[in-house]
Amino acid sequence: MLYYGTGQPVPMYDPEYRPGDNLYTNSTLAIDADTGKMVWYFQYTPNDAYDYDEVGSQMIYDVTINGEPRKVLGHFGRNGFYYTLDRTNGSFISAAQYVKNLNWTKGIDPKTGKPVEYDPSKKLQQYAAVSNRKSDQVDVCPDLQGAVSFFPTSYNPSKHIAYGAGIDGCMQLKVDETRMGGPFWNGGIATRNNRMGGHISAIDMTTGKVKVIRPLDYPVYSGVLATAGGLVFTATLDGTITAFDDESLEPLWSFNVGTSICAPPMSYSVGGKQFVALHVGGGVPWNIGVLKGTPELHTLEGGSSLFVFALD
């Protein structure tokens, strides 16, 4: 079986141009590898108006939930919720909010897994943060880059904990009517005048509930790496790589490389010694929006280097 996430509908911010659920966008798809046919799908944000595509990691694991062994797929949704699905049939098990700033919906229906405002009889959905051609500029959280976007996530199979790291912030959204022949971003304007922070979050996979949400001073694009030795690594855009305790997410060690970090950390061993390495440098992605809220990142030096650390 192949499991993968799909992108957002377009135009991204004008759902009136594309009424309906817009299947199979913003979804996890299960595809039979032999036939190429879709076995099941689960859509996270029908008729999406916020650019919450779900192309991030689809984690598969076996775990006991309420005393019952389950074959599970876990996913840090870009919309700010961690979803637990039955990977054999796509049925919804649970969802938990894993980021502080979230207002686009008032919650997830515990039976269906859909946003509580979702009405299948309507072609145009109105979630808690109303964004359409008639609405004024609205603050929407999470930001269009999500709480966790395409950044790698990780989990510890012995402790049954999943980890995600990303962005904690909001966007200001004003919808314009889409017109044929317009530019790629036609249909919406998204800016960020507020400060953009980050987060690292831990989920108990046996319950689907959040263990810890730790706010970070800067956004994360590098994802997260969990080790068998009780450490979790991530790196923020200011150039700081940090090792956290894998239970409490208390920071244990950090090092600033002097330039931005967007690449994921990796781990390997040589001669019985474990190392963590990551590529650093380059520009800040989507820099206009991110730098507007964190202007001190303008002073970061450029460059491209490989940093390697030994775990003693």
Each language-model region and where it sits:
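Membrane-proximal interfacial segments on either side of biological membranes
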Residues: 157-163
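Residue-level marker for isolated small/hydroxyl-bearing positions within beta-strands
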Residues: 5, 76, 165-167, 235, ...
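Short, surface-exposed beta-strand/loop micro-motifs that present aromatic residues
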Residues: 151-153, 267
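Outer-membrane beta-barrel transmembrane strands
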Residues: 145-149
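Extracytoplasmic/lumenal domain signature
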Residues: 15-54, 61-69, 81-139, 170-219, ...
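Short Ser/Thr-interspersed hydrophobic loop/turn segments at strand-loop and sheet-helix junctions
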Residues: 7-9
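Conserved redox-cofactor binding core of oxidoreductases
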Residues: 12
